[in-house]
Regions:
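Conserved AMP-binding/adenylation subdomain of ANL enzymes
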Residues: 3-20, 28-69, 154
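Thr-Gly-centered strand-to-loop micro-motif
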Residues: 23-24, 48-49, 98-99, 162, ...
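Gly/Ser/Thr-rich phosphate-binding loop
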Residues: 67-72, 81-146, 158
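Alpha-helix capping/helix-boundary segments
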Residues: 75-77, 103, 185
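Short Gly/Pro-enriched turn/cap motifs at secondary-structure boundaries
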Residues: 148-153, 202-204
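Conserved ATP/PPi-binding loop(s) of AMP-dependent carboxylate-activating enzymes
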Residues: 152-156, 167-199, 237
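AMP-binding/adenylate-forming catalytic core of the ANL superfamily
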Residues: 182, 187-188, 209-290, 299
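Flexible lysine-rich "adenylation lid" loop at the C-terminal edge of ANL adenylation domains
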Residues: 285-286, 291, 297-317
């Protein structure tokens, strides 16, 4: 599965022996490891560094060693936007990739438009650790006309959606669980030494746990996660859709909660804005404001791969 995914990534990103990546992501993160595997298996090279994108040394190394490819998660790209993406002088970079979460379309559009002027190809991607990192990609030429799409399956992979009864959904814009098949799917999880005797449990098929739909051109869109829901007064609310509502209003957000309580964390310092957001969300999802708690924070707790640490949110109420 590691070899298969490395080859597929190398193919759609056109990685050659002339390419050089930099360790912008942790090795123990599947996306970060896939960057290393795909470049080395193609005869390319890797620049090793412990510096982050917020450090001057990181960008110095990119130019010093003529790095051609840069990978990041949404948090990394939010940092790049804060630094001023239009001011970045990185002439050797030919392609930049993003996975590991969802960026708002406004941010993706700003990034892709700016990078296009610098002759840098920007790829938005989707993946799962259980599929050795990457499942689909959205080519740069489709970024602006397929807003929010995760694209199509990587080479040698296949995507489809099923309803809750496991039946194939073949109608456009109908939501179901996203299913993937390919040689890059792992065998399963070994929680004990005895599990190693079970063999290939997944048999090349991965139920992602994400809800998705596809359009008339066969491009897929994530609509939420099967386990990212809370029940508020009997209504099933998608936490991902709540985050999407606030992101589209221009604010970074993280949503969690429990039965009859929706907890939303937003990066801002305006109490009036908190009340306005609570009112807007209440109107959009049809839930009484008393069930909505909005917490203004300066930053989100994050895991070492840059993703939001949802378990840590309750510690900053």
């Amino acid at each position: 599965n590691l070899v298969s995914n490395a080859k597929s990534i190398s193919k759609y990103l056109a990685i050659t022996s002339d390419d050089r990546a930099i360790t912008s992501l942790p090795f123990n993160y599947s996306y970060g490891l896939s960057v290393i595997n795909s470049h080395l298996s193609s005869g390319g090279s890797i620049v090793l560094t412990n510096s982050s994108m917020m450090e001057r040394d990181f960008w110095h190394l990119i130019n010093k060693h003529s790095v051609t490819s840069l990978a990041g998660v949404p948090y990394n790209y939010e940092m790049i936007l804060r630094l001023g993406i239009d001011r970045l002088e990185i002439p050797s970079i030919k392609k930049m990739t993003q996975a590991g979460g969802k960026l708002s379309f406004d941010k993706i559009k700003k990034i892709s438009t700016t990078l296009q002027k610098k002759n840098i190809r920007f790829y938005s991607m989707y993946g799962q650790t259980e599929a050795t990192a990457r499942i689909s990609y959205l080519p740069p030429e489709n970024i602006n006309n397929k807003p929010g799409s995760i694209g199509k399956a990587i080479p040698n992979g296949k995507l489809w959606i099923e309803n809750k009864d496991g039946e194939l959904i073949d109608q456009i814009d109908s939501v179901g669980e996203l299913i993937y098949s390919g040689e890059n799917v792992s065998m399963g999880y070994a929680k004990s030494i005895n599990d190693l005797e079970l063999g290939d449990m997944n048999k090349g098929i991965l139920r992602t746990g994400d809800l998705a739909k596809f359009d008339s051109d066969g491009y897929y869109y994530i609509e939420g996660s099967t386990n990212r829901f809370v029940k508020i007064f009997g209504n099933r609310i998608s936490l991902d859709s709540i985050e999407e509502i606030i992101i589209n209003k221009g604010f970074e957000s993280a949503a969690t909660g429990y039965d009859d309580k929706l907890l939303i964390y937003v990066i801002h310092n305006n109490n009036l804005l908190t009340d306005l957001l609570r009112s807007d969300i209440s109107a959009e999802i049809g839930i009484n404001q008393t069930a909505i708690q909005i917490n203004a924070v300066s930053e989100f707790p994050r895991l070492n791969n840059g993703k939001i640490n949802y378990n840590g949110l309750t510690n900053i109420q």
